[in-house]
């Protein structure tokens, strides 16, 4: 079980031929996937080469908090009886 027999290699070759060879739809799809991966990698490398100039961060602003008026208790507003 450690090594692959001749039949295993024939099956692997047939699958690769179906995926990447010929003029079928599957080979076109695989080619498009490969182009997409290449352009993705190219975009990542371009981002690494040209870092954007970091603009200075604005200092944190403090918010003026107004004290909340004390709310009346429920027992004072809703009396039964």
Curated annotation (Swiss-Prot):
Listed transmembrane segments: 1-21
GO annotation, biological process: protein transport by the Tat complex
Glycosyltransferase listed as a keyword: no
GO cellular component: TAT protein transport complex
Annotated Pfam families: TatA_B_E
NCBIfam families: PRK00720.1, tatAE
Job description of the protein: Part of the twin-arginine translocation (Tat) system that transports large folded proteins containing a characteristic twin-arginine motif in their signal peptide across membranes. TatA could form the protein-conducting channel of the Tat system.
Name assigned to this protein: Sec-independent protein translocase protein TatA
Gene: tatA
């Amino acid at each position: 079980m450690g090594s692959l027999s001749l039949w295993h290699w024939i099956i692997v070759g047939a699958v690769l031929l179906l995926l990447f060879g010929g003029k079928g739809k599957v080979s076109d799809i695989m080619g498009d996937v490969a182009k997409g991966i290449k352009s993705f990698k190219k975009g990542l490398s371009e981002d690494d080469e040209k870092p954007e100039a970091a603009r200075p961060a604005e200092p944190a602003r403090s918010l003026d908090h107004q004290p909340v008026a004390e709310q009346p208790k429920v027992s004072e507003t809703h009396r039964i009886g």
